[in-house]
Every structure is written in C-alpha cells, then in structure tokens.
Design a protein with these regions (language model features):
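Non-transmembrane, aqueous-exposed alpha-helical and coiled segments at domain scale
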Residues: 1-403
Length: 403
C-alpha cells in the first residue's frame, strides 16, 4: 500500500491466516497501526504538517490553538458555523462541576500535578455518563467539553500544588489568556496579560498539538478501540505521557542546563562528556526517534525563547548555555554523523521557566497541547470503525511442564 505522500507499507492483514506467521517488531518502529489523514511527518527532511499545513506556516500566521484544534479534528481552517459553535462552546464551558473542585481537596500539596490531571480527567466521566456514546453529535460535544475543561483542571492542578485558591475562568478571554489568568491570577486583582508570553504559549501548544503515532496517542487509540469512556481514554493517554521517556524530556533538559551552570557553565566540557563512551552523561534535547534532521518545531521555539526573555527582562544564563551547546553540536562531526539535532524539548523548558511555570508542570503543559491530537485520533478511529486492538507476542517461556 502507498500513502498520499508516497510512504510505502506492506499490508500484512492476512499474513497469519495465510501463512501461520506473525511479525515481531518490539517498539513498533516498523509497524503502521492504522491509516490516518491527520498528521504527516518526514523525519529525514524535517517536515511536520497538520492536515497538509506545514507547522511553520501555522505558527507564522499566528493561527490560534483552538483553530488548530479544529483543524486536527475536522480537517479545515476556513470559518464556518460549525467552527464558530465549536470555539464558542470551548470559551463558555471552561468551568468544572463544583463537586469536582472539592475533589482536589483529596490531593496532598506534594501530589504531582500529573497525578491531579489524570485523576480529574477520569473523574469527568462521572459527570458525563454519555462518555462512551458512539453518536457523532455526542462525540463532538464531549470533545469540545474536554478541550474547554482540561485547561481549567491543569491550572487548578498547579494552584493546588502551591496551596493557592482557585481562580474561576473568565469567558471574556481567549483560550491561552484564560489559562494564564487561572494559573497566575490573584483574587481581587487585575491580571495583566503579556502579549509576547501569550503568543509564545499559543505557539508551544500548537507545536505540541499532534505528532502522529507516538506512545500516548497510540495508547489513546489502544484504549479507545475497546469503546472505553472517552474521558477515561484520554486519562490513559495522560498516564502514558507522564513517563520520562515521553513527556518529561524538557524537564530533563532544564535539569541538565542547571547542572552545567552550577558546575561553572563550561559547556565544552559537557560536549566532550557526551562524546565519551565511558561517560554516563547524555546531552538532553538532542536527537529524536523520528527526526533525522533539525526538528522543525525546535527552530520556531528557539526564536520564541529569546522574545519571551527579552519581554520579561529576564537574563537567563541557561539560554546562553543552550545556544552554545547547539552551536557546537551542529558543527561537530560526532553529532552531525549521528543526526543528533536539537528537538522541541531543547528550548521549550526555558520558555516555561521564564513564564513562571515550575518543572513539575512541564508535562502537564505537554498534555494540554497534545489533547486535540489525542482527540482527533480517537475520533478518526471511532468513525472509521476500527476493530479492537489486539497485538500478539512470541512466547519464549517454559514449554509444557508436569506438576
């Protein structure tokens, strides 16, 4: 079979039935689990497109996160009554049930914000008993409901972990502004929006909105294939994202940069350590499972990082260290020959840090951005009528034994 971008695959749907063989592909690096029209990636050329639109163009034109969400879900950017209704629903349904607000009291201050997020998204299923409906209209409403409410849950997860009172959503604000207001607003005080910060956060959310069949998206498809409740299915995706090999990479970058700074800022020393086979040090934020070229998202974020720091008048030495590491690595044969280029995580943590978002919230921010991608893939799977996912394994245990 051949995709619309000339990607070639071997259809093995009937392999076991006709030959008795199955394929073995640990990690699924050579396996296409489905057909999809949502996101195209060419890792060799550094291409990422949502529904045909290059990610760089979406950012350059300032397309909003809610518009990109609609694009991923329904395939179009053009204005329509359906799109207007979608955005209005998201704007006016950001509040969560008051009983859910009280659920937060069950979490300790030390609870990880991802624990709060995952649990509270699952709890939404208790307030939405039609979460397992296959009716297209109900599906679309539940999708908009999740996009509207997860940002509120994310902001409340942050405030809970800091012992701060919740700030209720303001329906007069756009998606990103409302999130920042709920995160950093104070009771009885006006919250002053910073347009550069809002724009940078919108960019980060857009860049993270989808990335084809990654671990968490595949988890959503896997759980959703059983027709599990949508809210619980998204919670499964959040759990998969929580893993440090998936959603925690930008936190690891910040911790690495902080370590280099505390050690005197000698970035050349750490370049040498990264190349030393005897060293356990790994240069975080370089290389990607898919991209064998410069991650197109990283190029965009690099510029946004400087804009945010300049706007907030922050002189962050970590940005200088990051730039120096990148400059050397892009010219060093060791990294070039191994196709180790900066990825999206290399600069995103610096932006979050400048905004005042703590490192334990970085993965929550990733989840907030990835939500429309999860929902788009779930919707596509349900409407395509894909059967329940059921991989097999090659048994390598004991043969039959006697008691």
């Amino acid at each position: 079979v051949e995709g619309s971008e000339n990607e070639k695959a071997i259809d093995i749907t009937s392999l076991r039935g006709s030959t008795g063989y199955i394929t073995l592909d640990p990690g699924y690096g050579n396996t296409g689990s489905c057909n999809s029209s949502i996101t195209f990636i060419d890792g060799e050329k550094g291409i990422l497109r949502y529904r045909g639109y290059p990610i760089e163009d979406l950012v350059k034109q300032g397309v909003s996160f809610t518009d990109v969400s609609y694009l991923l879900l329904y395939g179009e950017l053009e204005e329509s009554q359906k799109k207007t209704d979608f955005k209005e629903y998201i704007r006016t349904h950001a509040n969560i049930h008051e009983d859910m607000n009280r659920y937060f009291n069950g979490f300790t201050l030390s609870a990880h914000p991802m624990a709060n997020l995952s649990s509270m998204v699952t709890a939404l299923s208790g307030f939405n008993p039609d979460g397992d409906s296959q009716d297209p209209d109900v599906i679309d409403e539940n999708i908009a409901k999740l996009i509207a409410k997860v940002k509120t849950i994310a902001a409340y997860s942050y405030r809970k972990s800091h012992g701060m009172p919740f700030i209720y959503p303001d329906h007069n604000l756009n998606y990103v502004e409302n999130f920042l207001y709920m995160m950093f607003g104070e009771p009885q005080k006006d919250y002053i929006q910073n347009d550069v910060v809002s724009d940078a956060l919108n960019t980060l959310l857009v860049l993270h909105a989808d990335h084809e069949q990654n671990c968490s998206t595949s988890t959503v498809r896997m759980a959703g294939s059983s027709h599990a409740n949508l809210f619980a299915t998204i919670s499964a995706g959040i759990a998969a994202l929580w893993g440090p090999k998936h959603g925690g990479a930008n936190q690891a970058v910040i911790e690495m940069l902080e370590g280099i700074y505390k050690d005197g800022g000698d970035y050349k020393k750490y370049i040498d350590l990264a190349k030393d086979k005897q060293s356990e040090f790994r240069l975080m934020g370089f290389g990607h499972r898919v991209y064998k070229n410069y991650d197109p998202r990283a190029a965009v974020i690099k510029d946004k990082a400087k804009q945010v720091l300049d706007s907030l008048k922050i002189d962050d030495p970590l940005l200088d260290i990051a730039r120096n590491l990148e400059e050397i690595a892009l010219k060093d044969e060791y990294f070039v020959s191994r196709k180790l280029y900066p990825n999206v995580d290399f600069y995103s943590g610096i932006i979050y840090r400048a905004m005042g978002i703590p490192t334990n919230m970085f993965t929550v921010m990733f989840a907030l951005g990835r939500l429309p991608g999860w929902l788009a893939h779930w919707r596509e799977m349900v409407l395509d009528g894909q059967r329940i996912n059921r991989p097999r394994h090659i048994f390598t245990g004991n043969t039959k034994r006697s008691l």
